[in-house]
């Protein structure tokens, strides 16, 4: 692999703070001086730009993969503790060179979550954030924004509708219905306050938002912070969700609606995540800071287990159409993916590879699982383990020392 060293302008607040009055060339000289590097080994901005435009990559270190026929793709490094790509990212990059991979369209025009913005409620992190390992771009997907003013392009494999905040116009509804009728896969994410706009859409799939907002009483967290776990059916359907359960993680929903399903529309439903039995649909309280949520059955509040995520399927045009419905749109937002909740072992980011793996018919992200080796289990009781600890840590080393002394004494005697 050929490596080319260069320097160019980057977005780096630390450099701006350290050298506020210096330009790119002057900053470059300061850096090479500090690292004792030869400045002549680096191509200047004007030179590297003649070879390739790396501004869309943030002028970061990247690897360019290129075929003789001209196809190109980037293999990036990431802002995590491992930095370099794993087998999943490497394989996805090579597959991108030789085949068409799924394209995900994100609906716009009705106040949906924005894939370009980095605000807490938006979706840039898991879609277009190139330094984020688990973003769709790095896992083999293409991403683009879609509006319903014209028919949805035929190369869109998965359509994401994340919290519409206004109703569809008749022509827009027609274009969406055409996509659904042709068997396109969808991911639909709602919010408790968007029932007015989301229920008409969800009704086409036999799904309805439970009135109110789910709450659960906690000593440490707000009532509207609801923790859900994968169902047994969800673990069997998507292996990523099985990993959440095995590692005893959960998914956090900061404001979520329960989901009800009716099979009259021809879909089959599989519940993926559910609450515990102490959760209820709060109909009255909306201020969970200064007010207290209390169960009131007279208002239609019911304390029970609620499904918060559903997987729907039906046969269309000889293939299986897949629809995934969430009662919460914040669970995979920028803010939720970049924050934590003390005392809660959350794994919300696992929703991304798991959901899109299923929606892409298990094409990407790449499944790199391997059969478990047959000799990786040691059957020892706690008492036996303690015994072997003593043998390995003390008895065997002592025998080795005694043997060494015997050999030394015999040689000395000779």
Give residue ranges: language-model regions:
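Acidic, S/T/G-rich, low-cysteine, solvent-exposed domains in lumenal/extracellular/periplasmic regions
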Residues: 124-364
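Hydrophobic targeting/anchoring helices
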Residues: 1-131, 135, 364-368, 377-394, ...
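Pocket-edge structural micro-motifs
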Residues: 67, 76-77, 108, 273-276, ...
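Conserved beta-strand termini and adjacent loop/short-helix elements that scaffold enzyme active sites
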Residues: 4-8, 107, 146-148, 212, ...
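A glycine-rich phosphate-binding loop feature that marks nucleotide/adenosyl-phosphate handling sites
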Residues: 218, 372-374
């Amino acid at each position: 692999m050929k490596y080319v060293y260069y320097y160019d302008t980057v977005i780096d607040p630390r450099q701006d703070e350290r050298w506020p009055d210096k330009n790119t060339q002057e900053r470059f000289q300061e850096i090479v001086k500090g690292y004792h590097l030869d400045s002549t080994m680096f191509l200047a901005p004007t030179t590297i730009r003649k070879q390739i435009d790396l501004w869309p990559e943030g002028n970061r270190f990247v690897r360019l993969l290129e075929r003789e026929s001209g196809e190109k793709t980037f293999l990036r490094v990431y802002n995590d503790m491992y930095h370099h790509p794993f087998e999943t990212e490497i394989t996805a990059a090579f597959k991108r060179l030789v085949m068409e991979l799924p394209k995900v369209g994100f609906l716009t025009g009705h106040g949906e979550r924005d894939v370009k913005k980095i605000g807490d409620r938006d979706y840039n992190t898991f879609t277009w954030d190139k330094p984020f390992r688990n973003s769709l771009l790095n896992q083999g997907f293409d991403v683009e924004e879609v509006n319903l003013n014209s028919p949805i392009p035929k190369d869109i494999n998965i359509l994401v509708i994340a919290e519409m905040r206004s109703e569809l116009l008749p022509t827009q509804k027609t274009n969406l219905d055409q996509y659904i009728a042709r068997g396109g896969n969808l991911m639909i994410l709602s919010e408790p306050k968007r029932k007015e706009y989301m229920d008409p859409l969800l009704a086409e799939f036999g799904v309805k938002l439970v009135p109110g907002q789910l709450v659960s009483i906690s000593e440490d967290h707000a009532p509207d912070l609801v923790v859900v776990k994968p169902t047994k059916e969800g673990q069997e359907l998507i292996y990523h969700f099985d990993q959440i359960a095995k590692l005893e993680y959960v998914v956090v929903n900061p404001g979520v609606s329960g989901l009800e399903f009716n099979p009259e529309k021809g879909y089959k439903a599989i519940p993926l995540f559910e609450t515990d039995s102490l959760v209820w649909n709060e109909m009255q309280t909306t201020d969970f800071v200064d007010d207290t949520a209390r169960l009131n059955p007279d208002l239609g509040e019911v304390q029970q287990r609620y499904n918060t995520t559903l997987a729907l399927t039906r046969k269309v045009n000889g293939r299986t159409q897949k629809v995934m419905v969430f009662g919460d749109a914040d669970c995979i937002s920028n803010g939720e993916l970049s924050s934590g909740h003390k005392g809660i072992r959350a794994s919300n980011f696992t929703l991304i590879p798991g959901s899109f793996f299923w929606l892409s018919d298990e094409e990407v992200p790449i499944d790199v699982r391997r059969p478990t080796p047959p000799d990786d289990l040691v059957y020892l009781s706690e008492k036996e383990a303690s015994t072997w600890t003593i043998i390995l840590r003390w008895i065997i080393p002592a025998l080795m020392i005694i043997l060494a002394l015997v050999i030394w004494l015999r040689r000395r005697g000779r």
